[in-house]
Amino acid sequence: MFKIIVSFFCDHVFLSVIWLISCVLMIFFTLKDILFCTQFISIMKLIRCINYDRCLLIIDARTEKCFLKGHIINSVNIPYIDVKSVCNISVFKKYKNFSIVIVFKNDNQIDRNYVNFFKSIGCNKIYILRGGMNGWLSNNYPTVCLK
């Protein structure tokens, strides 16, 4: 049986490499949430939290320019580019028991260092908005614009 598998891989190298890469990527993306200990929150669940949860902090990690064009109501802008220089850690001490939702532009631009920064200062309930702000906008949910 093993000889048959090895001969197949030798005869079809290109197909075998593509198959192996596909398997590795599938396993990685399946276990990504577990490996990085990050929880995602759906847009609908975030809307429920905005309406009913008073212990909620929404942090928009996009640039200030994008934030001013439109953001989720009651969110604060802390760009992921300069999170450590902008943030006064003592400010976040009062939010340690809050649920923190971090909004990136989309799921492809999640910065693990940004999330880990908030974990390192003692914030435990950290969620990432699935689909990011692009997902929010594509569903035509309301935004607040500051000009």
Curated annotation (Swiss-Prot):
InterPro entries: Rhodanese-like_dom (IPR001763), Rhodanese-like_dom_sf (IPR036873). CDD domains: RHOD. It comes from Buchnera aphidicola subsp. Baizongia pistaciae (strain Bp). The lineage of its organism: Bacteria, Pseudomonadati, Pseudomonadota, Gammaproteobacteria, Enterobacterales. Gene3D superfamilies: Rhodanese-like domain. Residues 52-145 form the Rhodanese domain. It comes from the Bacteria. This is Uncharacterized protein bbp_050.
